[in-house]
Design a protein with these regions (language model features):
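Residue immediately C-terminal to the conserved phosphorylatable aspartate in receiver
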Residues: 48, 68-69, 83
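Phosphate-binding loop of NTP-binding sites
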Residues: 10-12, 32-38, 58, 72, ...
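Preference for short coil/turn "hinge" residues that link or interrupt alpha-helices
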Residues: 6, 17-25, 50, 66, ...
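ATP-dependent carboxylate-amine ligase
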Residues: 1-52, 58-63, 75, 79, ...
Length: 203
């Protein structure tokens, strides 16, 4: 992510701004919504189905719409989507028609990461979830109170994410759609690499 885009995303992820997350029940979108709410933003979101994830968000005071409808984005200053949500989604189409900026999930995480003194990203073809879980265990044992986003369930957390108050953030960094190229880690760990990731890194 270039500096110009980084600054644009940062401007919209400021306290008091209204942000709408399309696909908010996803494994990396749910903690994103909680982190943004903790930063002082007004967060809403939508997902195709009701789930434990959406119920948790509602319990935390986040308004969640079930189903994707154009009117769900009303009042939003910006919209954030997962890589799996395409331009033909009615909320994305409505945002673009209204001139509301649409950012990718990874771009939002990249900006948030810059607010932490210690940012750790774990990537690779295999072993990301296991390695991220191991790092989380170590940081929790060291009482670093980290913010964590894992692409799986960690019994220690009773979830796949954690919103902490420490100066450390740990993200399992997915290579899908080159998402991890939007991050700004202090430490980057690559586990097993296969051809697809090597191509991404070389280009």
């Amino acid at each position: 992510m270039n500096e110009r885009l980084t600054q644009k995303v940062k401007k919209y992820l400021a306290p008091g701004k209204r942000v709408h997350l399309v696909g908010i029940g996803g494994v990396s979108m749910r903690p994103l919504g909680l982190v943004l709410k903790g930063m002082g933003l007004i967060v809403t979101g939508s997902d195709m189905n009701s789930s434990v994830s959406t119920d948790e968000l509602i319990d935390q005071g986040i308004r969640v719409f079930i189903g994707h409808q154009a009117e769900n984005i009303q009042g939003a200053d910006c919209v954030i989507r997962t890589a799996a949500v395409h331009n033909d989604n009615p909320e994305i189409a409505a945002a673009r028609a209204a001139g509301i900026p649409v950012f990718e999930r990874a771009q939002a995480w990249g900006v948030i990461m810059q607010e932490y003194q210690n940012a750790v990203c774990i990537s690779g073809t295999h072993g990301k979830t296991t390695t991220t879980s191991m790092v989380t265990h170590i940081l929790m044992e060291a009482q670093k109170d980290p913010t964590v986003m894992i692409g799986g369930y960690l019994p220690l957390l009773h979830a796949g994410h954690r919103v902490g108050n420490g100066d450390t953030i740990v993200l399992e960094s997915c290579e899908y759609c080159d998402s991890f190229l939007n991050f700004f880690p202090r430490w980057q760990w690559f586990s097993i690499l296969k051809k697809t990731i090597w191509i991404t890194l070389r280009t």
